[in-house]
Amino acid sequence: MKVVAFERKEQGTGASRRLRNAGKTTGIVYGGEAAPQMIELDHNALWHALKKEAFHSSILDLEVAGQSQQVLLRDVQYHPFKQLVLHVDFQRVDAKKKLHTKVPLHFLNAEVSPAVKLSSAIVSHVATEIEVECLPAALPEFLEVDLSKIEAGQSIHAKDIALPKGVALTAHVDAENPVIASATIPAGAVSDAAEGETPAA
């Protein structure tokens, strides 16, 4: 995904306000061996790009002054109540160095699972993203979590995710192995089931 930005020479609150009034958003590019670079971007184009999941989790081709560099979106600052992006941070990516970043989780097949079909359980998504480490070329846009076999009362953990080749959970996620999805039967459904049972004669 390509992003076009422009070099920013003015700094400070006043300069940022003038840029916002002109339909621009301030940003910074940092990391790698190069010095941090102040940039400005078209606000409307950035606003629409931020609505795309891939913009948050993929390697981006950032073009500044005709030169392209690979980056990851690292931070976005929004206005408290206006539909306004105040500032963005991008981190340069080294093709030879592993990066740590969060990848979205896409949950599939819950509707055909035993938990839902046999027990009328509710499958809850406890996490929507997971932190992984890999080389930039191996970074997945998202990870799929197959829920087709989950049963009522069961949970799916981070280590249950099928990871692509070259991708691993970060050390702390691997150690904690957090729950990412669970299947529970609503309290009302349990009560109804109990009331429906008749004692044996």
Curated annotation (Swiss-Prot):
Keywords: Ribonucleoprotein, Ribosomal protein, RNA-binding, rRNA-binding. The keyword RNA-binding applies. GO terms for biological process: translation. The keyword rRNA-binding applies. Disulfide bonds: none annotated. GO terms for molecular function: 5S rRNA binding; structural constituent of ribosome. It comes from the Bacteria. GO terms for cellular component: cytosolic large ribosomal subunit. Part of the 50S ribosomal subunit; part of the 5S rRNA/L5/L18/L25 subcomplex. Contacts the 5S rRNA. Binds to the 5S rRNA independently of L5 and L18. HAMAP family: Ribosomal_bL25 (MF_01336), Ribosomal_bL25_CTC (MF_01334). This is one of the proteins that binds to the 5S RNA in the ribosome where it forms part of the central protuberance. Belongs to the bacterial ribosomal protein bL25 family. CTC subfamily. This is Large ribosomal subunit protein bL25. It comes from Burkholderia multivorans (strain ATCC 17616 / 249).
